[in-house]
């Protein structure tokens, strides 16, 4: 049930009947304060200006055409021409009841699209670090939301599995296998990469061999392809452990690395030349873009092939967008890549559009995000100033959560404690990130993220168990409430019901904007409203059975909404804390 969409349609019809153009924007929003009703329509001012009418006069005319019978019990004009809409308690009650009868809590499915989501993208032969965390968990929350809404989502893990470094890595892997006379487990990927680089920098013969291996690998030599595959397999197996720990839905089947697009690159360069988009410049192949200027104010040159014949990331990204449209048949492509890559992506996509590889009707969206900072406001590092490994971060989260849970539950059996600590620790790391607007940098702070107050995972997980405890105390089976009526007589009941019915609107925003923090804010607000409702509207000691059962149903929908909302974020819920 999308009340905002329903009201937008009704207000739009009334505006048109009052003389507004057919494309007028009703601007229906959720009200910020209860005294302004549940929704406000703010579109009158803009339309009044176009029509040359006083806004309040137009608002009064709109009201004569506005049919909200059975939806709102009060509609009033406020200020210069805002229309405040108060939802009818009977309307709220019937839709709460309908939501409880639906597995999807009454959430409708929009027209299904094929949506490619590019996220995570670690590098081969390197261990995942905290820099991969934001793309991985924000992208996965978007994927879960889009899938819940019924879209066909193609996860694209654009791993760095190609490039000149593979000559060096294969040469070192070969050396290790010869010296160790057997299979080598790349347990320490960082160490392996570091040692390979050291050999490359200090041993001229090794470096020469590495360079020759690049040529052989790129030429498709089977031995070198096999060595390359081994490096990719070992890396992705290790990454999968991190994905599993993070409760992220990526699997090996979602890997679409840079190597996938490599065979397309010569054809793309030739095609861009044929279309007169690319030209030779100082031995390299360059696309000059009028949309971007260099320091001299001239069109910026984007290199797509170097003098030595090598290709660049831009060339790969052009091929990648083309592949996603032509082969994967994407209706929309979302890229969860940090904000520093914005200009690079925009330039690649400008070339893609000019070449006609992806039509304008297919959005290419950079859902960029800021950096993860330490308490000092600088990039998050180890005490020694190194990069924080993702596995170390998750280990610490688990250890801190274990101590926290044990302190609050000294008698909890070890197995249950471990399960709860995992849900709280991993949930805390993810939620701390997801609850911030992704476009900004955010401060990583253990104390804040593991707090049981405020907009945190432990608070949200606790809020969920608190709602469930009502049913344990009532000693009632939820199915016994199926035929009970929802009756809304108190303001707190109405406020909670209205917020519960805004779940679909929240999902719609997350799906459209790729902003999971909107869902976090909604769930936090919902938990707060339930708290006020629980305090002021006695459930188990209600005046009569009708009120008791009705309030239990509001509690039931609150629990289901919290659980489903947290699930779209990839945050695990627990039954007890």
UniProtKB/Swiss-Prot annotation:
EC numbers, comma separated: 6.1.1.19
InterPro entries associated with the record: aa-tRNA-synth_I_CS, Arg-tRNA-ligase, Arg-tRNA-synth_N, Arg-tRNA-synth_N_sf, ArgRS_core, DALR_anticod-bd, Rossmann-like_a/b/a_fold, tRNAsynth_Ia_anticodon-bd
A molecular-function term among this protein's GO annotations: ATP binding
Subcellular location: Cytoplasm
Span of the annotated motif 'HIGH' region: 122-132
Family matches, as NCBIfam families: argS
Entry protein name: Arginine--tRNA ligase
Encoding gene, per UniProt annotation: argS
């Amino acid at each position: 049930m999308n009340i905002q969409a329903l009201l937008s349609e009704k207000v739009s019809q009334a505006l048109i009947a009052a003389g507004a153009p057919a494309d007028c924007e009703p601007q229906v929003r959720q009200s910020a304060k209860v005294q302004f009703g549940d929704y406000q329509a703010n579109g009158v001012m803009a339309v009044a200006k176009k029509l040359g009418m006083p806004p309040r006069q137009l608002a009064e005319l709109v009201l004569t055409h506005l049919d909200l019978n059975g939806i709102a019990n009060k509609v009033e004009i406020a200020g210069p021409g805002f229309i405040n809409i108060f939802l009818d308690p009977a309307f709220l009650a019937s839709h709460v009841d309908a939501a409880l009868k639906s597995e999807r809590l009454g959430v409708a499915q929009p027209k299904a699209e094929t949506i490619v989501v590019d996220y995570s993208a670690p590098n081969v032969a390197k261990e995942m670090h905290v820099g991969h965390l934001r793309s991985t968990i924000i992208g996965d929350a978007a994927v879960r939301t889009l899938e819940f809404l019924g879209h066909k989502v193609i996860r694209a893990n654009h791993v760095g599995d190609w490039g000149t470094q593979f000559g060096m890595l294969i040469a070192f892997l070969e050396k290790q296998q010869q010296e160790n006379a057997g299979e080598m487990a790349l347990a320490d990927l960082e160490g392996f990469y570091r040692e390979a680089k050291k050999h490359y920098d200090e041993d001229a013969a090794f470096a020469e061999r590495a360079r020759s291996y690049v040529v052989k690998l790129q030429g498709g030599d089977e031995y070198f392809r096999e060595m390359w595959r081994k490096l990719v397999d070992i890396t992705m197996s290790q990454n999968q452990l991190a994905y599993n720990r993070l409760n992220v839905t990526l699997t090996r089947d979602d890997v679409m690395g840079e190597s996938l697009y490599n065979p397309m690159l010569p054809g793309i360069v030739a095609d861009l030349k044929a279309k007169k988009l690319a030209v030779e410049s100082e031995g390299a192949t360059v696309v000059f873009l009028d949309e971007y200027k260099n320091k001299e104010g001239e069109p910026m040159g984007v290199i797509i092939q170097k003098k030595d014949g090598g290709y660049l990331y831009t060339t790969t990204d052009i091929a990648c967008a083309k592949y996603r449209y032509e082969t994967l048949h994407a209706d929309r492509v979302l890229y969860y890549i940090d904000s520093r890559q914005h200009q690079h992506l925009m330039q690649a996509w400008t070339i893609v559009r000019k070449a006609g590889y992806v039509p304008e009707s297919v959005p290419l969206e950079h859902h960029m995000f800021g950096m993860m900072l330490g308490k000092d406001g600088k990039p998050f590092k180890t005490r020694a100033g190194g990069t924080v490994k993702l596995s170390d971060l998750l280990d610490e989260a688990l250890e801190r959560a274990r101590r926290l849970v044990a302190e609050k539950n000294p008698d909890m059996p070890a197995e249950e404690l471990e399960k709860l600590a995992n849900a709280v620790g991993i949930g805390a790391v993810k939620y701390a990130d997801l609850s911030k607007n992704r476009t900004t940098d955010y401060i990583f702070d253990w104390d804040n993220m593991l707090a049981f107050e405020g907009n945190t995972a432990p608070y949200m997980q606790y809020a969920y168990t608190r709602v469930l405890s009502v049913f344990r105390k009532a000693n009632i089976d939820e199915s016994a409430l199926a035929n009970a009526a929802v009756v809304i007589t108190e303001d707190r009941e109405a406020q909670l019901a209205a917020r519960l019915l805004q779940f679909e609107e929240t999902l719609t925003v997350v799906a459209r904007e790729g902003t999971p923090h909107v869902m976090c804010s909604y769930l936090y607000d919902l938990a707060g409203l339930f708290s006020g409702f629980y305090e002021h509207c006695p459930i188990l000691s209600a005046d009569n059975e009708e009120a008791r059962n009705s309030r239990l149903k509001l509690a039931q929908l609150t629990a289901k909404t919290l659980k489903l909302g947290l699930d779209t974020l990839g945050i695990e819920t627990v039954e007890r804390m």
